[in-house]
């Protein structure tokens, strides 16, 4: 049984340290909201409020860093213990059992020389002739389970993908047309590196739609 690092991380965060991960998520959310509020506050006009928010942001940032370090260290220790347990369960115990029952057949093949020299391989290492040994049987079962697990991952685990939008055509005042291609990644402006003007968005949201359309038409014509 093979478990990837991402699967182990999901298992550890959601089950083993669920309370700590929930606390970390709430702290990150509070930090994001406080930082947004601080960016909306003018440091010159409302310095006392801005300074208070700044201290709150610094405090939350330090708490988030400490919580991340705590989770990372505990995850490292737990991963070593978990991998040791899985090694004993998947490798050490089957090896001991196969060695102890190496002469005991799992079942016998149909009588006859159907398999030829393969019959000796089925009885490896010390099972009676014409039988399937425990070593071969556990190896085949483990391989089948591994293949089923890989097919299940490919079937149920889907990768994220980018959605391409159709080309947009913009008309100029001279009558010429300009075609541009836009790729939508569904990411916020902070992740794409674009400058986000919150005050502009608030002002535009408060104005009627007709005025907004007229202003956008004037900008496109310019």
From Swiss-Prot:
Compositional bias annotation for Basic and acidic residues: 194-206
Major subcellular site: endoplasmic reticulum
Keywords noted in UniProt: Coiled coil, Endoplasmic reticulum, Membrane, Transmembrane, Transmembrane helix, Transport
Intracellular or extracellular location(s): Endoplasmic reticulum membrane
Record's bilayer topology term: Multi-pass membrane protein
Transmembrane segments: 87-107, 132-148
Residue ranges of coiled coil: 48-75
GO biological process: tail-anchored membrane protein insertion into ER membrane
Listed GO CC annotations: endoplasmic reticulum membrane; GET complex
Entry keyword annotation includes Manganese: no
Topology, Lumenal side: 108-131
Region of interest called Disordered, as start-end residue ranges on this chain: 168-222
Cytoplasmic topological intervals: 1-86, 149-222
Subunit structure: Interacts with GET3.
Free-text function comment from the UniProt entry: Required for the post-translational delivery of tail-anchored (TA) proteins to the endoplasmic reticulum. Acts as a membrane receptor for soluble GET3, which recognizes and selectively binds the transmembrane domain of TA proteins in the cytosol.
Record PANTHER family: GUIDED ENTRY OF TAIL-ANCHORED PROTEINS FACTOR 1, TAIL-ANCHORED PROTEIN INSERTION RECEPTOR WRB
Protein name: Protein GET1
Native organism: Malassezia globosa (strain ATCC MYA-4612 / CBS 7966)
Gene behind this protein: GET1
